[in-house]
A protein has these predicted regions:
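Solvent-exposed, amphipathic alpha-helical segments
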Residues: 28, 32-39, 82-90, 169-180
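Short secondary-structure transition hinges
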Residues: 106-145, 179
Length: 202
């Protein structure tokens, strides 16, 4: 009985070590991929170079990330999670909250750098985007569903409007603007105002 417990404990410890190594390898690959994309751009980023920088063979990259696109998907999910954490329970009317979202997305660009940020946004309009990556499943989209839902409760947005659809429209338009390099404060403010006007109850 004691030997069985000892064997079980040893197996558990070995599994924990393997998992820790797996996560460490994945993190190295992720960082190496971001560095490669930053330096060469997404299209030119080379998986063999990424694997070499992480100290693993090429096949190991695909074990952790089925495609290069999956790296950008993870970058975006991480940034979106950070943004909604920073926004918290954002207060204010619909226009002010959407304006805050825009500012936080711009901060994400400064953190990531132009190359990674634009390639990340460009993925939304690419035929190579993994089919499982639906915008409505993103943390930021879910956050916007809640924001728009509150606006519906307050009578600012029609109750029969689809909050998920409206949130997707907002993010898709914003990403399209930013992916072209549009960062003019007045332009982005007009974009928010136009979107809100389109959402509001007539």
């Amino acid at each position: 009985m004691a030997s069985a417990r000892a064997a079980s404990s040893a197996n558990s410890a070995a599994a924990s070590v393997r998992e820790a190594r797996r996560l460490e390898t994945r993190a190295r690959l992720f960082d190496a991929a971001l560095s490669e994309i930053s330096q060469r751009g997404f299209a030119a980023a080379d998986v063999s170079a990424i694997a070499a920088a992480a100290g693993v063979v090429r096949g190991t990259f695909y074990f952790h990330f089925p495609t290069k696109e999956h790296v950008l998907i993870e970058v975006e999910r991480n940034e979106e999670t950070r943004i909604i954490s920073e926004l918290g329970d954002a207060k204010g009317d619909l226009a002010s909250v959407l304006a805050q979202v825009v500012q936080h997305v711009l901060r994400a660009e400064r953190r990531l750098g132009d190359a990674v940020f634009r390639d990340m946004l460009g993925l939304h309009f690419s035929s190579t985007r993994p089919v499982e990556d639906e915008l409505t499943q993103h943390p930021l989209a879910q956050f916007l569903v809640g924001v728009i839902g509150r606006a519906q409760d307050e009578g600012q947005v029609p109750a029969d409007a689809d909050a998920a659809e409206l949130g997707t429209f907002f993010l898709t338009g914003l990403f399209a603007l930013l992916s072209t390099g549009a960062h003019d404060e007045a332009l982005l403010s007009r974009y928010v105002a136009t979107i809100v006007k389109g959402m509001e109850r007539r």
